[in-house]
Amino acid sequence: MFCTINQKAVQPAKPSDTTTPQYPADFFNKNNHQKPTVRVTQRGYKIQELREIISNGIVQDDLNSHHVVRYMELIMEDITDTLDEDWNSFGVKIGRKGDKITPLSLVNVMIEEDELIDGKRNNGVNKKDDKWIMLVITSYYRFAFSQNQNHRSNLITKLNLQLRTFLKDPPTIVDNMGLFTSLISNINFTKLISALDMFLNRFKNNDWSYLRFGTIASRYKDCSALMSLSHVCDVTGMKMEEFMDWIFVYSTGEDMIKLMKEGNEIDNPMSYMPYTMSMGLSTKSPYSSINCPSIYSFIHMLGSFLGSERSRNARMVSENNIVNLKVNAGVVSYVKSHRASMIKAFISNDVKEQWYNNDDNDNENGGDDESDEELDEMPKGDNPVEWFMYLESRHFELPEEIKNFMNREARKITNPRVGTIGKFVSTMN
């Protein structure tokens, strides 16, 4: 820009304190494809001593994260299963077919000497109690990330019911966010939780698979933008390529490029990738709604118009470019509500030959039917290119029919939660 006051060129800039997100592939490339490291202290403790300390700590609602990490490491040494094929991720050789591995096979464990931290003990426990002790401490991880108090209370109720299957007179677990957050503040605790979940995700029939009640929260942590892609495909019935064809907003396209960055194994369910944040592979997730707000808002506005409860309850994380996102979402939701994509999945053998002959004739003689359509008329099909050209011819001003559709759907949203996309959509005029 040129300033008319001082007759000098001015370079526009705005302040930014944002951290650059790191992709999981970057972590492994920088660390020579080594496994994530877990540091375990309290080496001098044996399993029975920790069993007594932690069981008492659960009853007293007072746990030390260093005790918990050492205890988990000792328990996880004995959680085993056998690979039915090679397991590799980001160049890390986790195991070969036929190998018996443990959750600790996913990380590099470094056990360190330090001064032992004392703790009160419960002498009435033995190896059989490990099942319920592990259930409690892994559940604490999930509770720590449940910000909604009602949801957290429901989870705690479910845990207390599960404990009755292990003990005749189990301890009653209460809501103690101070305790929960103190555990997750220890990165080695979260790494062990992640390794355990990654292992149990692979071996779903393992005897310890019930622990995923708590560990599941480590999978795809801070990946809400990426996970919303699966959601929009489910709601609309579109494949990913079809959905991408409907992106008409620049910032949404930029976010899609971030999410689809190659080499990060997002399509490999057995990868380290779902544990990018919980395993400490990144300090800022590239797949979060904060890093990709446009795609996240677009998808959940679209879902809200189409009646998705999940979308209506999604948090409103940003208002950047919100007007264009609303228009894009309104168009796609209108088309998907009024232009169904259907096929004749089955035909009788009697008409099979006639069916394919007619189909061939349609392909030869059709295809140009809509090319003569006037640009001032709404497309009759669901071709995103035709819809974009139609909107472009109107300078992207929505026709009244689509505006009315959006207003009707917005009025159907009753009692939306404050701070949600559903609340934003419901207040549209």
From Swiss-Prot:
InterPro entries: Rhabdo_ncapsid, Rhabdovirus_ncapsid_C, Rhabdovirus_ncapsid_N, Rhabdovirus_nucleoprotein-like. Residues 359-376 have a biased composition (Acidic residues). Encapsidates the genome, protecting it from nucleases. If expressed without protein P it binds non-specifically RNA and therefore can bind it's own mRNA. Interaction with protein P abolishes any non-specific RNA binding, and prevents phosphorylation. The soluble N-P complex encapsidates specifically the genomic RNA, with protein N protecting the genome like a pearl necklace. The encapsidated genomic RNA is termed the nucleocapsid (NC) and serves as template for viral transcription and replication. Protein N binds protein P in the NC through a different interaction, and can be phosphorylated. The keyword Mitochondrion does not apply. Keywords: Capsid protein, Helical capsid protein, Host cytoplasm, Phosphoprotein, Ribonucleoprotein, RNA-binding, Viral nucleoprotein, Virion. Transmembrane segments: none annotated. Residues 355-378 are annotated as: Disordered. Its main location: virion. Belongs to the ephemerovirus nucleocapsid protein family. The keyword Cell membrane does not apply. The gene is N. It is found in: Virion; Host cytoplasm. GO terms for molecular function: RNA binding. Pfam families: Rhabdo_ncap (PF00945). It comes from the Viruses. Coiled coil: none annotated. Homomultimerizes to form the nucleocapsid. Binds to viral genomic RNA. GO terms for cellular component: helical viral capsid; host cell cytoplasm; ribonucleoprotein complex; viral nucleocapsid. This is Nucleoprotein.
